[in-house]
Every structure is written in C-alpha cells, then in structure tokens.
C-alpha cells in the first residue's frame, strides 16, 4: 500500500466515524475511566506560616521592576488590625494549597461586618501591578485576589479556592469604629502528590547547577497535584505536551510513575469520538476534556509519553491496553500526508504548537515531529508484540526522512530551512535532529550556523528551549548544552526564581502571550526539565 492509498483509507475511516457518530473506544472508555479514578493520588500536606513581613521596592534592576525587602518576623497577630491596615507576608517559597485565618474581637462587640482583601501572588511585580482596567486575554478570574466579608468574628475561615503563590497581601477595606479586632493566626496547607526525591545529586555537582536542580524539582513538585498540572496558579488541568516533559523530569526526581499512569488513562478515557485525543483534560471542577482543543503535536507526543512510561515501569499491561489509542493518533496524523511524503500543514485547519514565537514557520518541524512519532510508536509496538500491526512504519520513516532532507535541508548552507520563505529557526534544526533526519555531525553544524545568524528565530520560552538542549545532547554538543542550561535556567535563578517560569526571555522581562504579564505562570510544568538533563547526563552536568 503506497502512502496516497494509506492516507485515503485512514481518512475514510475517520470520516465514517464522524458521519455515523460511532465512538472509536466506546467499549473501552468505562474501564479506562475506572483505572484513572483508582489511580488518583493522595495529596501530601504540609502546614506553613509566613517567614517574614516584607515591603515592596520599585527597582529597575529587579525582575519586572519590583522586589521585596524583609521587615523581619511578622508581629501583627496581637495588634489591632485597624491600626495595621495592610501587611504583605512572605511564605519563603512557592506553595500551592489552601489558606486559613482566624480573627478575634479585642474589645466591645462586633456591630458590623469586616471586609478584608487578600492578594496572593507568585512574584513581586504581579503583586504590585494594578489589575484593573483588565488588559489580559485570559479571564480576570485567574488573578488571585479575594474579598472576604466577616459577619462573625472569633472563628476560622478557610478560603475555598486553591491558591498558588509565595506572597500574600492583606488589606482592611472596611470596619466599624465600634470595636477592634486582630488576625491572631493564619496558616497555609500546602499540597502535592510528589513525595520525596528519589534521585540525589552527586557530591561533585557544582553549586550553581545544584541550585538549578533544586528549583527545577520545586517546579515539578508544585505541578504534581492529582494530575500533572501545567501551572497550579491557573488551570487545574493536564496538558499532553507538558505531561511528556514532566514524565521525563519525574524519572530523575520523584519517580512517581503511578501519577503518569493516572494521566495517560485520563487522556484515553476522554478521547474524542473519532479516537483522537484532546490537548488537555480538566481535573477540576470536574473531570473532562476541553472540547474543541485539538493539538496534533500534543496527540503525537502522548505516544512518546506512553513509550517512556513503559520503559520506566515495565508495565506491559497498561501499554498494551492503551496501544490502540497510540495507533489511532498516528492514523489521524497520516491524513495530513501528501503523496510526496511531506506533511501538509494546510490539509485542514489544525493547531500545531511548538513555541509561542510569533511568525514561526512549522513546516519543517512538523515533518520531523511526525517522523519522531512514527519511530516512537513503532518502538512501542515492538516492545508489546504489536509490530505486525504497523509494519509499514519503518518504510514510512525512511520515505519521510528522504523527503524531509530534499524539502528542508540546505546542503550548501548546512542548515534546515522551513516554508516558502526558507525561514531559519532554532526549532527547525532541533526537531530535525530529534527525528534523526540530520546526523549528529550535520546537526552540530546546523545548530552552530543557526545560532550564528542574527536573523534566526530563537526559542521564546522554556518549552522550546528544552528541545534545543535535547538536540545539543543528541549531537554531542555537551559543553554547549551545559552552558545554555546554566545561562537560561540559571538566569531565572539569578533573577530570583524559586520555581521556573512559563515565559522567559533573558532580554524581555515583560514577555507574555496573554497581553498582561501578571497572568504568566511563575511555576510552570514545561520549565521543569533541567532536572531531567542533570539526572540523565551526570557526567556532563554534575562534574
């Protein structure tokens, strides 16, 4: 069967499914959902209190123009809060969970409600930037400011919303002149399913890299809730692209593989009727996918996550149970293939995410991502004894690799180009290397050439930067990979990060995809992978 015929057959199968409303995995989904529910992790709890009261300082040399100065140990507990008026507290590190506080009347009787405002924030600038009028492209509701009206003092109050923060500002908005009151106690119940680190660093590990590993691990831990969340400040949900990177980092830190299994089954249980996975699944307020959010690159990387899970655990039962889901993702992706073995990104509307970089041409990297997915899926099939079901994959890989080199590799310039404008980007080089389209020698030259060209589109964030370092390691550019990791993630540490950020450009502290930088997550899953590189390659990063 040639590629044109194969694609036509697969497209007809998909069309039949959509036309007649049949659910590809209807008989399997109830069992998958039950496995997902049975593997829901227990959250470990830790009670924390603030370590200092702080004062905001506007400082152009600080990240995003703000920093905090310590005022010492908080001592407001016995004071009349009407005299305190406002206080900002530092809990010492990024934490996720639930906030409780207690108030008491100091004299007379409460004759009117008390109104308090609580502002929780991850970074100093977020805490000190006016939120209104709202400019963000995501919901104003994601910001962690809460107004509480107390009609009955002398009791504990727990805010129902889960918070993710380091700093807390408490403001008195309204009270009666007829009585005084104090906030005499408060605490935070931090939660995570991570457990303890299982992979200690070598004693030879340099302090700078040790600190990067610590922050990386803290980032992953905060995102490990009842699913691998992408960032606990905003969505209580699981993204497939983030899950792949989190599973790699988890291997060299907490080794909580049951959580990976839980997440794989959640995706499968909520697959679309056509058998294709949604890009993300909600964990809260109730389980379910974000309908309509289909990202082909994330569908394909789910297969790689399943493969890596099998390698980590030897859980052949799960891999075999979910094999048909992996196979279906490839079937769907193959409907985008042209007869000349090139992935056609214009075959039908589709979201292909590699980076937030504006103007990024994804033709070359999508060709490579498809090759990489075919390789990983065939390896998965071979490991579970299903290679005969996809015996055409090796030939497809060979044909697509040949087509990729012809269409996208400029032999004279020794670089990968993409699209009608022959765009040069770092990601086009890295994905061609990851897919094995370029040899290590060719890959080294391509990366060097791309980095030397001032017109090259660079990665705009940690997700894409992960793949650059991955490509450098594949090509044997060990020293350059180490330098890049220390420069990039170490740059965040030097700017005060205690967890790694969703968006980071060393030359643009205000970078945001949401038109308002306080919406950015300062603890984000796709930024946790230094611990993967540091753990996997100790001879490069720990000596």
Regions found by a protein language model. Give the residues of each.
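Active-site core of glycosidic bond-cleaving carbohydrate-active enzymes
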Residues: 239-543
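A generic structural signal for short, non-catalytic loop/turn and secondary-structure boundary residues
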Residues: 11-14, 82, 111, 527
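Short linear Ser/Thr-Pro motifs
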Residues: 15, 121-123, 425
């Amino acid at each position: 069967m040639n590629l044109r015929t194969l694609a036509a057959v697969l497209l007809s199968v998909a069309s039949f499914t959509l036309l007649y409303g049949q659910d590809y995995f209807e008989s399997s989904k109830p069992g998958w959902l039950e496995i997902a529910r049975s593997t829901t992790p227990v959250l470990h709890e830790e009670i924390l209190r603030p370590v200092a009261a702080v004062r905001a300082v506007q400082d152009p040399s600080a990240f995003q123009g703000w920093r905090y100065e310590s005022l010492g140990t908080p001592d407001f507990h016995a004071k009349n809060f009407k005299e305190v008026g406002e206080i900002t507290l530092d809990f010492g590190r990024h934490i996720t969970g639930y906030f409780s506080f207690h108030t008491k009347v100091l004299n007379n009787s409460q004759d009117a409600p008390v109104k308090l405002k609580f502002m929780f924030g991850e970074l100093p600038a977020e805490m000190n930037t006016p939120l209104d009028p709202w400019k963000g492209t995501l919901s104003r509701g994601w910001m962690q400011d809460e107004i509480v009206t107390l009609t009955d003092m002398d009791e504990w109050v727990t805010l129902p919303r889960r918070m993710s923060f380091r700093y807390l500002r408490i403001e008195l908005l309204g009270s009666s002149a007829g009585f005084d009151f104090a906030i005499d106690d408060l605490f935070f119940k931090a939660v995570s399913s991570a457990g303890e680190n299982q992979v200690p660093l070598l004693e030879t590990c340099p302090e700078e890299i040790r600190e990067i590993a610590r922050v990386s691990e803290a980032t992953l831990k905060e995102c490990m809730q009842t699913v691998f969340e992408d960032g606990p400040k905003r969505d209580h949900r699981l993204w497939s692209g983030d899950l792949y990177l989190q599973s790699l980092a988890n291997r060299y830190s907490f080794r909580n593989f049951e959580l990976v299994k839980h997440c794989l089954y959640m995706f499968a249980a909520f697959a679309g009727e056509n058998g294709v996975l949604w890009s993300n699944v909600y964990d809260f307020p109730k389980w379910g996918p974000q309908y309509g959010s289909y990202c082909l690159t994330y569908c394909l990387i789910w297969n790689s996550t399943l493969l890596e899970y099998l390698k980590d655990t030897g859980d052949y039962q799960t891999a075999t149970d979910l094999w048909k889901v992996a196979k279906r993702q490839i079937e769907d992706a193959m409907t985008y293939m042209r007869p000349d073995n090139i992935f056609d990104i214009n075959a039908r509307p589709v979201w292909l995410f590699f980076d937030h970089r504006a103007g990024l041409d994804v033709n070359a990297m999508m060709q490579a991502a498809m090759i990489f997915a075919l390789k990983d899926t065939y390896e998965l099939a071979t490991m579970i004894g299903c290679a005969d079901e996809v015996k055409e994959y090796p030939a497809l890989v060979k044909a697509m690799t040949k087509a990729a080199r012809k269409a996208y590799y400029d032999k004279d310039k020794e670089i990968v180009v993409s699209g009608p404008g022959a765009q040069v980007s770092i990601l086009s080089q890295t994905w061609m290397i990851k897919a094995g389209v370029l040899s290590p020698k060719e890959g080294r030259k391509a990366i060097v050439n791309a980095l030397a060209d001032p017109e090259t589109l660079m990665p705009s964030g940690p997700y894409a930067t992960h793949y650059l370092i991955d490509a450098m390691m594949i090509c044997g550019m060990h020293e350059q990979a180490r330098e890049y990791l220390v420069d990039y993630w170490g740059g965040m540490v030097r700017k005060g990060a205690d967890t790694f950020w969703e968006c980071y450009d060393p030359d643009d502290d205000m970078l945001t995809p949401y038109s308002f930088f306080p919406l950015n997550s300062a603890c984000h899953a796709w930024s946790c992978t230094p611990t993967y590189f540091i753990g996997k390659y100790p001879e490069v990063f720990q000596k």
